[in-house]
């Protein structure tokens, strides 16, 4: 009974329907353009691959590096801190100051495989998680060199872009929660 009393065709004549379609299309386009800056990819800085070369990681690579870091490293390095030794962190100045410097992807990969003290004098193979002690640190067992590069890239990009990354307990980490 209602369908006979109300005719959609009569209410919206073809010209009105076209106008409605154009209006909806304009609203959808305007809505989409308004959201474009919100969903735009962040600017990812290049980081050092080696002392003489640089590399820029993709969002997908950084996402995988973050996942691997959170699985294998974040137990002791939450937010770039170093809980066993809070005087040395993963902030760029600390990575640059190590001997040898750990301020590039390949140097961090080498450190993960063969950790040494900050001054480079003593081996930490028996103490620091590494790819050789896989029975003690099973989370490192299946990491490939490519995985290690993604972890290193994630660390270096965070050190360059995240306020408070690698800060000590006395420094503010109020902005870090968005990045973890």
Curated annotation (Swiss-Prot):
UniProt GO MF annotations: electron transfer activity; heme binding; metal ion binding
UniProt name for this protein: Photosystem II extrinsic protein V
Q: Explain how, and how many, cofactor molecules are bound.
A: Binds 1 heme c group covalently per subunit.
Known role: One of the extrinsic, lumenal subunits of photosystem II (PSII). PSII is a light-driven water plastoquinone oxidoreductase, using light energy to abstract electrons from H(2)O, generating a proton gradient subsequently used for ATP formation. The extrinsic proteins stabilize the structure of photosystem II oxygen-evolving complex (OEC), the ion environment of oxygen evolution and protect the OEC against heat-induced inactivation. Low-potential cytochrome c that plays a role in the OEC of PSII.
User: Where is it found, in Gene Ontology cellular component terms?
Assistant: photosystem II; plasma membrane-derived thylakoid membrane
Q: What do we know about how this protein assembles, alone or with others? A: PSII is composed of 1 copy each of membrane proteins PsbA, PsbB, PsbC, PsbD, PsbE, PsbF, PsbH, PsbI, PsbJ, PsbK, PsbL, PsbM, PsbT, PsbX, PsbY, PsbZ, Psb30/Ycf12, peripheral proteins PsbO, CyanoQ (PsbQ), PsbU, PsbV and a large number of cofactors. It forms dimeric complexes.
Q: Which cofactor does it need?
A: heme c
Q: Which SUPFAM superfamilies match?
A: Cytochrome c
Which family does the similarity line name? Belongs to the cytochrome c family. PsbV subfamily.
Report the InterPro entries cross-referenced here. Answer: Cyt_c-like_dom (IPR009056), Cyt_c-like_dom_sf (IPR036909), Cytochrom_C550 (IPR029490), PsbV_cyt_c550 (IPR017851)
Which compartment or compartments is the protein found in? Cellular thylakoid membrane
Topological category with respect to the lipid bilayer? Peripheral membrane protein
Q: Which organism is it from?
A: Synechococcus sp. (strain JA-2-3B'a(2-13)) (Cyanobacteria bacterium Yellowstone B-Prime)
GO BP terms, alphabetized: photosynthesis, light reaction
Signal peptide segment = 1-40
UniProt keyword terms in alphabetical order:
Electron transport, Heme, Iron, Membrane, Metal-binding, Photosynthesis, Photosystem II, Signal, Thylakoid, Transport
Binding residue positions for heme c: 73, 76-77, 128
Taxonomic lineage is: Bacteria, Bacillati, Cyanobacteriota, Cyanophyceae, Synechococcales
